A protein has these predicted regions:
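N-terminal subdomain of nucleotide-sugar transferases
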Residues: 1-42
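Helix N-cap/beta->alpha junction signal
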Residues: 13, 106-107, 155-157
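Conserved nucleotide-sugar phosphate-binding/catalytic loop shared by glycosyltransferases and other
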Residues: 34-81, 88
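Active-site-proximal region of nucleotide-activated glycan assembly enzymes
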Residues: 122-166
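Structural motif
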Residues: 10, 38, 103-105, 127
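An aromatic- and histidine-rich active-site surface loop
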Residues: 102-119
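Short N-terminal targeting/anchoring amphipathic segment
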Residues: 90-107
């Protein structure tokens, strides 16, 4: 019997959920993969459409909902959100056998899972690395994820070259 591969996917916003949705459906077609979905960021906020309901409507079982995110964009709120999620994700990573963690894009909400992946030596699969968003912290966050990632799936050859040059 082949060893099951445990893949945890982390989604933070509607913007990347179409990719998460597609990947979950594809992975679940193959019995070798065990997938678990961790939902955080804006998915649970009413003022962002409470998109957690869309995730459930797609038939996905949510393994963990991270509820510490608030819509405040000030640095103190963001750091507190990340701090709280570091602890929650640490509890998961301490107990679970995880082979890979899938992270999409560049949102600061992902930093808590990146830190835990590094500390618990979990391999990060990053989708959307190498892209450029000038004038905001997205580039810095994306580059942190890219540097921490074990596997990269850039959206174009240009972005692939940017990752290689890092």
């Amino acid at each position: 019997m082949k060893k099951k591969i445990r893949i945890y996917l982390f989604t933070t916003s509607r913007a990347e959920f179409a990719l998460v949705n597609y990947l979950l459906h594809e992975l679940r077609k193959n019995k070798i993969f065990i997938t678990k979905l961790i939902v955080g960021g804006t998915h649970n906020l009413s003022n962002y459409g409470k998109t957690i309901n869309e995730i459930k409507d797609q038939g996905h079982k949510i393994y963990k909902i991270l509820k510490s995110f608030k819509s405040n964009d000030d640095p103190n709120s963001i750091v507190n959100y990340i701090k709280n999620d570091i602890g929650e994700i640490n509890n998961i990573f301490s107990k679970e056998k995880i082979d890979y963690v899938v992270i999409f894009g560049d949102r600061y909400e992902t930093l808590s899972i990146v830190i835990n992946s590094i500390m618990h030596q979990k391999k990060i699969i990053h989708l959307g690395g190498g892209e450029i968003t000038e004038g905001v912290i997205d580039d810095q966050v994306r580059n942190i994820i890219t540097k921490a990632a074990y596997y990269h799936f850039p959206s174009s050859e240009f972005y692939k070259k940017r990752i290689i040059n890092m």
